[in-house]
């Protein structure tokens, strides 16, 4: 089965959501209705899956809006994925700016993340 660690934040799994075996989830984490974490997925925390998303590989600090997919291996961090977006197999993103400066996230995106976390 999956491994769930809520020491760093709550984990909410909605009715009809599925976490496949071998997955590791660290809170805070929200998974809305009908979403699926594929086999062996690693969620490092601060992640929200909107309704009917499919997620695999590694994710950290990501908001997936409804029906968005990242169903295969690869790393995705510090991102907002819009509704109906699909990331192909082995998609990777960097969460480090190429000049090593701090990344700045707009207030709008932070508000959106809090909305999905139901704050």
Where are these regions (language model features)?
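Structural signal for interior beta-strand "rungs" in well-ordered beta-sheet cores
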Residues: 1-119
């Amino acid at each position: 089965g999956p491994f769930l660690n809520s020491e760093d934040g709550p984990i909410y799994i909605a009715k009809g959501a599925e976490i496949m075996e071998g997955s590791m989830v660290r809170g805070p984490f929200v998974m809305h209705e009908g979403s699926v974490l594929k086999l062996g997925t690693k969620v490092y925390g601060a992640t929200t899956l909107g309704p009917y998303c499919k997620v695999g590989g590694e994710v950290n600090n990501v908001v997936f809006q409804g029906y968005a997919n990242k169903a295969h291996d690869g790393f995705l961090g510090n991102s907002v994925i819009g509704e109906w977006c699909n990331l192909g197999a082995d998609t990777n993103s960097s969460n480090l700016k190429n000049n090593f400066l701090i990344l700045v996230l707009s207030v709008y995106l932070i508000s959106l993340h809090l909305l999905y976390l139901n704050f």
